[in-house]
């Protein structure tokens, strides 16, 4: 699994011209699921995202997590995070999981993340054409991959 975690002032998802979900201060998490991903990897990623200390403390130092600040969260599926641009100029998405793997993994991530942070997590709709708006705060953007835990 690969995620892009963005600290936001606010974020929203619109589908078909209708507002689907929105959050205030917190995290927007874009999640890409790889064909070879397993549920055992999900727990590491959930805990890492929930506990990332990327919010400022009283001294202006990024030392607080989403849990510490009581922020909101939104998780949006994004298979393009697994694009390969190794050959040619057209990205290949062959590593991205198909629906039969990706949907249950996405739903499990959302469910576990919601449990971890103790509140409902806003989402997009898997596979939908979505317009995602955000005000990136900082900007602070962190990329993580369960296959390369740096």
Descriptions of predicted regions:
Residues 122-139:
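Short, active-site-adjacent segments that bind or coordinate small-molecule cofactors and metal centers
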Residues 28-32, 135-142:
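Short basic, glycine-rich beta-strand/loop surfaces that mediate nucleic-acid
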Residues 95-96, 137-150:
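Short, low-complexity, polybasic intrinsically disordered segments
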Residues 6-8, 69, 135-137:
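A short, compositionally biased micro-patch
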Residues 18-70, 77, 81-111, 116, ...:
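Compact, glycine-rich, soluble single-domain proteins
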């Amino acid at each position: 699994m690969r995620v892009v975690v963005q600290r936001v002032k606010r974020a929203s998802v619109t589908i078909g011209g209708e507002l689907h979900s929105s959050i205030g201060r917190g995290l927007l998490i874009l999640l890409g699921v790889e064909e070879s991903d397993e549920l055992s990897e999900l727990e590491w990623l959930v805990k890492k995202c929930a506990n990332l200390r990327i919010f400022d403390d009283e001294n202006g130092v990024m030392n607080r997590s989403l849990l510490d600040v009581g922020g909101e969260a939104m998780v949006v599926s994004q298979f393009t995070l697994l694009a390969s641009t190794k050959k040619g100029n057209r990205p290949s998405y062959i590593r991205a999981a198909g629906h039969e793997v990706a949907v249950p993994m996405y739903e499990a991530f959302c469910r576990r993340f919601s449990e971890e942070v103790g509140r409902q997590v806003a989402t997009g709709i898997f596979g939908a054409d979505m317009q995602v708006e955000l005000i990136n705060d900082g900007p602070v953007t962190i990329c993580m991959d369960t296959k390369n835990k740096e």
